[in-house]
């Protein structure tokens, strides 16, 4: 798929298709008005006849419009002009791309990037158009015997920008959008892989491959023997019921002019399958527990995008790979684990395993003396109850870092909402036998999970992203979303300086 930007008049475009917007009720966008004038009112006559109202997502494909050089014109319903917001814009782009791909328009010039989207500039509109296009065209069918094929798929897309001065901004937006989309695709692919393929060793192989592909990335894999030497007893306990070895993949990206500059650390929960262990989950939808490694998948995707963008940062990405299975060797409710930090944890529920893996990973990264640490995990069902499937949960021990991540979430459209972490919630983790319990009861489950992790992140600025509600979708079109890759990459773009962003 080839992307480019240009600045030109619609009547001069010689392409398979021109894409322009129509607002409710049957109001032509400025670009559509130009085409209508050139075609002697042909388009407006169709609208008066009622062929298109302009409601969001409506499509009308026109052939051989009078006096127009392009073969086709696609009219796209954009809703009410003053109500065109971020979500609607992205939905319109996705529907447009699907229509172009299905109708044999192998190339197109898209003028939707000239629409006014409240509070957003050309950079944002072009980048989101690229990301939405890639998202719309994504498929995961490698395990199907008969793969459906599009006869004449969309291969080339040109986004028009209002002025020539904005061409460089548009080109940067395409570069960023493609890099982020590459990371999102990598994350989706990892998440969608079946758990009999994507085990901890598979995660490690992907981390090694990333190092093979980019000179700026090195990877080392820590297996169970080394974990024992490091004292990662909590991490090891979670995986001891599985015949698949637990593996923690450590990817180091060196892009900063000073190789010794303090790194940003990203940690991803990589439970490649979570049965719940002895505290076995219900069988209904248990297949979706292959997505319990989507935190690690998003960190992997962010590292890939980072390497493609070649940002001037030092970043460490940790994939905390593990599998939680029931067996005679599994850890049990009632066990007391000594973590790498020396703190002890009473296990009350073996299905609250992600925090037992992450706590040792959080201790491990102290050796980097990090600038900050962000962990990502599909950690709690409570986050789905609190925030649904639209917004990531965010907790942090450092206000400036939390504000940075919230800002990045707003910029990228991959939204997050900060939850509190006051001392009262910590009391729910009290145990009569150990330093803490691994669960704090039903009330405030996302917050108490964050409070648990915070006890292992006292030596640096830390934030936790709970993506349990956003990492995948269920139902007939189930699959990984690749979130929060774009949030993480936007955070890294912002950290790399204004010249890297807009």
UniProtKB/Swiss-Prot annotation:
State where Mn(2+) 1 binds: 274, 351, 353
Annotated catalysed reactions: Release of an N-terminal amino acid, Xaa-|-Yaa-, in which Xaa is preferably Leu, but may be other amino acids including Pro although not Arg or Lys, and Yaa may be Pro. Amino acid amides and methyl esters are also readily hydrolyzed, but rates on arylamides are exceedingly low; Release of an N-terminal amino acid, preferentially leucine, but not glutamic or aspartic acids
Per UniProt, the keywords (alphabetical) are: Aminopeptidase, Cytoplasm, Hydrolase, Manganese, Metal-binding, Protease
Q: Name one GO biological process term.
A: proteolysis
Q: Which cofactor does it need?
A: Mn(2+)
Instruction: Tell me which domain of life the UniProt entry assigns to the organism this sequence originates from.
Output: Bacteria
Give the first-level EC class, as a single word.
hydrolase
Q: Which residues bind Mn(2+) 2?
A: 269, 274, 292, 353
Keyword Metal-binding in the entry? The reply is yes
Subcellular location, record wording: Cytoplasm
Active site at 281, 355
The UniProt function text for this chain reads:
Presumably involved in the processing and regular turnover of intracellular proteins. Catalyzes the removal of unsubstituted N-terminal amino acids from various peptides.
**Classification via NCBIfam families:** PRK00913.1-1 (NF002072), PRK00913.1-4 (NF002074)
PANTHER family the UniProt entry points to: CYTOSOL AMINOPEPTIDASE, LEUCINE AMINOPEPTIDASE-RELATED
**Which named protein is this?**
Probable cytosol aminopeptidase
Organism of derivation = Aliivibrio salmonicida (strain LFI1238)
